Structures are given as structure tokens and as C-alpha cells.
Amino acid sequence: MFSEVDSIIFPDSCEVIQVASQQFVYPIFKCGRSSLTMSMESKGWTFVPESDIAKITKPITVFLRDPHERFLSGVNTYLQHLAAEGNNLDQHTVLYFINRYLFLNRHYAPQFFWLLNLARFARPDTLVTFSPIAEINQLTDLNHRAEIKPITDELQEKINSFSWSHLELYLYLDQVLLDQVGKTIKLHDLITHVQTNHSTLYELVFWPTLNIANVLP
């Protein structure tokens, strides 16, 4: 990793839930993860050991959410978590750093970034099936908010005043994922799809990192 923030957004850990003999789910923050994990004990679900994720041969279900809606919800959650931790940070300061440096926490980091982290533990030919967040009720009827209060109109207005021109690159990356809803695709093919069909987006988002990494032996 190039910075401590990288280790937050792309941690050396990965959660995949086994919900049946050959049925798996990859839970993403702000995409029903709390509801899924809170249902595990009552439903007898278990986490797949990280060393076994690459052994999964059946498609892994990934629930996706509207990128803009999830960003608002994720920033709201991040702010409330900081407040609960007792950090003496005012909201204006935190929002400034989010607007300036974007992704400081996984709750509002792009869903595509979550897929990249899954790819680190899976195989290139691991299959993922994308489903809309509304279909999570097929697995659990629990709607757990993790004690997070809904976003206020005031906070939503502040976030909507961000410099969206840069942020929209990443939200569009998630929109590419939403276009795959209802489909099953290999992780490697998903990344190749972005590189081939959205080459400008791929270069703007990933080329700076690749350019730095290429100098390493």
C-alpha cells in the first residue's frame, strides 16, 4: 500500500458469508451488510475463511445500491461514527477533507473498490452475481440501521455542494456495476470490461496508481 488510507480502503481482510451449501454473499458497507451480519446467528450462516474464498466455485452474490444515494448515506454514517468515538472534530472540517481527498472510509468508498478487494482474495475466474439492494429481502427481512440516524436535510445539502466533477468519476464507476445487475460475470472479465469499454474512466481512476507501481521491480 502507498499510504495508510490505502490500508483502510483495501484492508488485508475480506468477508464472504455462506448462506447455504452452495450460496454465498459478499456484504458491502451501506448495501445491507449490517442486516446480513445481524441475521447470521439466527439463520446459521457463517463467514467463509479467507483462505477458502478462492476455493468458491459458485457465483458470489453482491448487492448493489445507487451510487449517489450510497455516498450520502456513507458520509452520514462516517460522521456519526467519528462523533461516537469522541473525536473533537467539527462537521465542517470533516466534510472539507472528504470533499478534498474523497475516500477516507469504506462506508462511502466506491462499491467497485470493494470488488477489487474481493478480487485480492478470490481467483480471476471467480464468479459474481450482481443484485439490486431491494432483493436482499429474499435472504433476510431484518432492516438493521446499526444505530445510525437518517441523514438530515442540512447535511445532505452540504454534501451536495461538494465538487462533484471529480467525485462523479467514481460514482460512474459504480454505475458501470449497476449496469451488470442481473448478470453473472468473472471478476477478471469485469475489470477488463471497464478497461475496454470505459477506457478513459479506467485511465483517470487507475492509471496514476499503475504508473507509480510500474517503477517497482
Residue ranges of each PLM-predicted region?
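Catalytic nucleophile-elbow at a beta strand-turn-alpha helix junction centered on a G-D-S/GDSL motif
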Residues: 27-40, 65-69
